[in-house]
């Protein structure tokens, strides 16, 4: 991978801020990027007036995209590149110690290069899968260039948010897209709330209209409750006698990352399956009306709503098992490749002069203690978010069960970061501690 360094150095990047970014500036940059994202979602791609198959509606929820516009691919290329790199490193095909800062920077650079390549690969797949109807070779080329270029812009908008804003661009785009879907679905002119009230006035209340809203609220409460659960490890300062503290480890240790990666993987399987089917190679399944009807693609497609679950319970069970296993796998890979493993966390705690209360001061002792919590929490939290996302899909929550889960989790994390940013600005001493 080191042979790619000359190429990586030539890829444009958003420079790191030369000075500390204030809270107001972070809000400003986050707002600017959000506005640009919505503007791009309103700019139609030339010749993109064809009917969109139902499969691409699922792609929109997971990848924060809007088919037929500049953000047709959404964050798909970014997430797909992340999946590929995670699998390559996690499986040992690429030998790389990501605890070394230089290796981690190289890993991120290669992931960015792969993201740009995937912009063009997925653009070709979309056109080949018939997302824009039947096009002449010239028009197909123009559409590919437009949607690939739009996705490359999103890559750099994600960088801007990561370096100058609050949270990450990926999370921001998903939350924005799903929130819009929930608002329109519940309170729009044809929203479920008005339909339910109308049926109530007519004396024949229809529970089907209010069920998606109730499902969304249930998912919201469950995610917030899970985000508040944590394990606290008592710490003692090695130099200041009597100084104690606590190191909190959240139950949802890996956040929503496993669900994002798993859902994106399943969406890519649908996309590849449809493209191959149109080429006469139905190895992933056959399709009717843009939806898989058999094969791997069918069993990894989302059964949305209770009616779908009841009509084919085997499909629902296989999908749930696959989602949970995939989330656990990506959760483990994510912890190992992002420095959240016990060894890396022990180094961070040790560098602050802290030690586990009641144990001798050494990174090995801290690591041994953390191994009792981090690996089990990684597996349990990954399985939990996978299970919850699946149940939310089965209930038929607005914005898609997976989308609601991701949005609530993302917004909650952004809320926590906003509080930290505000406290840091008011109390500089606390800022130093939080940064460490």
Swiss-Prot record:
Membrane topology: Multi-pass membrane protein
Record GO biological process: SRP-dependent cotranslational protein targeting to membrane, translocation
Species the sequence originates in: Methanocaldococcus jannaschii (strain ATCC 43067 / DSM 2661 / JAL-1 / JCM 10045 / NBRC 100440)
Protein name (record): Protein translocase subunit SecY
Topological domains annotated Cytoplasmic: 1-28, 89-110, 162-168, 228-255, 332-382, 413-436
Manganese is among the record's keywords: no
Gene name, Swiss-Prot/TrEMBL: secY
Family: Belongs to the SecY/SEC61-alpha family.
NCBIfam families reported in the protein's UniProt record: 3a0501s007, PRK08568.1-5
């Amino acid at each position: 991978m080191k042979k790619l360094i000359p190429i990586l150095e030539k890829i444009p990047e958003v420079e790191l801020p030369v000075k500390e970014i204030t809270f107001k500036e972070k809000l400003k940059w986050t707002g600017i990027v959000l506005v640009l994202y919505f503007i791009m979602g309103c700019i139609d791609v030339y010749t993109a007036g064809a009917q969109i198959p139902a499969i691409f509606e699922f792609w929109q929820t997971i990848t924060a995209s809007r088919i037929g516009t500049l953000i047709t691919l959404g964050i798909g290329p970014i997430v797909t590149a992340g999946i590929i790199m995670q699998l390559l490193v996690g499986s040992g095909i690429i030998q790389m110690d990501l605890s070394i800062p230089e290796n981690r920077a190289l890993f991120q650079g290669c992931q960015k290069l792969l993201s740009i390549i995937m912009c063009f690969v997925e653009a070709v797949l979309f056109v080949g899968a018939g997302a824009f109807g039947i096009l002449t070779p010239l028009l197909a080329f123009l559409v590919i260039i437009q949607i690939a270029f739009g996705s490359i812009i999103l890559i750099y908008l994600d960088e801007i948010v990561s370096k100058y804003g609050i949270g990450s661009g990926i999370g921001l785009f998903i939350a924005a897209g799903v929130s819009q879907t929930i608002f329109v679905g519940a309170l729009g002119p044809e929203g479920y709330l008005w339909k339910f009230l109308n049926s109530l006035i007519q004396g024949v209340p229809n529970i089907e209209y209010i069920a998606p809203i109730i499902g969304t609220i249930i998912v919201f409460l469950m995610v917030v409750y899970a985000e508040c659960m944590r394990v606290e490890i008592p710490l003692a300062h090695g130099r200041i006698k009597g100084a104690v503290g606590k190191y909190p480890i959240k139950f949802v240790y890996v956040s929503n990352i496993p669900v994002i990666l798993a859902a994106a993987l399943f969406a890519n399987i649908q996309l590849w399956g449809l493209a191959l089917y149109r080429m006469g190679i139905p190895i992933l399944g056959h399709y009717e009306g843009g939806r898989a009807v058999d094969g791997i693609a069918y069993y990894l497609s989302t059964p949305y709503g209770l009616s779908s679950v009841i009509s084919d319970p085997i499909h629902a069970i296989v999908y749930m098992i696959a989602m949970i296993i995939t989330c656990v796998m990506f959760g483990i890979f994510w912890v190992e490749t992002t420095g959240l493993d016990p060894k890396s966390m022990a180094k961070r705690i040790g560098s602050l002069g802290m030690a586990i209360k009641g144990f001798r001061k050494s990174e090995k002792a801290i690591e041994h203690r953390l191994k009792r919590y981090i690996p089990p929490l990684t597996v349990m939290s990954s399985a939990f978010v996978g299970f919850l996302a699946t149940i939310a899909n089965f209930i038929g929550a607005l914005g898609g069960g997976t989308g609601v889960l991701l949005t609530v989790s993302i917004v909650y994390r952004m809320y926590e970061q906003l509080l930290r940013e505000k406290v840091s600005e008011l109390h500089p001493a606390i800022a130093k501690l939080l940064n460490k």
